[in-house]
């Protein structure tokens, strides 16, 4: 149990740090802040698909705890995505909210599928 908690914790710190850095990197480049979160979530979807695919050929629970649960769990953020959607809706930016929701869902599905393909599961 302690080993699992330690692995998740060791992965979570760099995942959260990288998310912070990437979102702040995208912010000056793209006027709408929600696209930084989008980029992080799509890349996390790809990486999770890749890990799941690779884990099928070379199973490793400690690696999944460190990278999937710890790193990617703190790197991507569904709750921020939902808040950003609600902010757009409250601003009456319904088209932008719909575009973000569809792009996130479709992009996430394709990213996971691509990760699974590269990881050898698909």
PLM segments and residue spans:
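Membrane-interface helix-loop junctions in multi-pass transporters/channels
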Residues: 1-122
């Amino acid at each position: 149990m302690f080993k699992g908690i330690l692995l998740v914790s060791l992965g979570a710190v760099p995942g959260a740090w990288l998310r912070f850095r990437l979102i702040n990197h995208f912010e000056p480049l793209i006027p709408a802040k929600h696209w930084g979160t989008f980029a992080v979530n799509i890349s996390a979807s790809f990486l999770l698909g890749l890990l799941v695919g690779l884990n099928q050929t070379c199973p490793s629970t400690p690696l999944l705890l460190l990278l999937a649960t710890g790193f990617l769990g703190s790197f991507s953020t569904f709750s921020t995505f939902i808040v950003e959607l609600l902010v757009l809706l409250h601003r009456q930016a319904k088209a932008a909210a719909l575009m973000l929701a569809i792009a996130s869902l479709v992009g996430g599905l394709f990213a996971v599928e691509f990760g699974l393909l590269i990881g050898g599961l698909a």
